[in-house]
Amino acid sequence: MLAIYKRELKSYFRSFIGFLFIAVTLFFLGLYFSVYNLMNGYPYFAYVVSSVTFLFMLTVPILTMRILAEEKRSKTDQLILTAPVSVGGIVMGKFLALLTIFAIPVAIICFYPLIMAQYGSVPMGEAYLSILAYFLFGMTAIAIGLFLSSVTESQVIAAVLTFLVLFLGYMMDSICSIISSTGNLLTKLLRCFDLYTCLLYTSPSPRDGLLS
C-alpha cells in the first residue's frame, strides 16, 4: 500500500495536477478570507469554508478522474493486481495520496484564524470545527470521485460523472424545497444525499458580528 501511495503522490506532482489543485484551492480560500474576514471584519471563519464548497465540483473531478480510469485504459491495473497487495490496499493507497494533496491547503488555512485573532476576538473552537468539517466534506467528495473513476476507462466520463454527482448534492437542498409539497418521506430520503447543507448550517451569518 505504501508503494502505491508514493507512486500516486509522485505522479500527481510530476503532472502538476497536484500543484494546480492546491493553488486553485488556496486562491479561492484566500480570496474569501481577505474579503470577508480581513476587509469586512467578519469574525467567523466558517463562513469562508462554506462559501467555497462549490469549488469541489470543479477541482475534485479533475483531481480524481485519472486515479483508476487511466489504470483501466492502459491495462496497468492488471499488473498492479498481481502485486503482493490486496485490492483494498491499492484503493486505500490511492485514496490516501489524494487525501494528502487535499490536506496541504487545509493545513495552510489552519493559520487563518490565528491571523484573524490579531485583529480582534475570534471564536477559535468554531473556526477549527468548520475547518474539520471542510476536511471531512472534502474526503467525501474525493471518495465519490475515486469510486466513479473505477467504473469507467475514460477520464472524461469519470470527471463528468463526478461533477454531476457533486452538482446534484450541491442542488439537493433546492430540489427538496421545490418538491417538499409532495410529502415529507420523499423529502427526507432526498436530504440523505444533500452533501452541502450540513456544512452551510455550521456557518453563521456574516452580519452576526465584526472583528473588534
Question: What name fits each language-model region?
Answer:
Residues M1-G18:
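Aromatic- and glycine-rich beta-strand/loop motifs that create alpha-glucan
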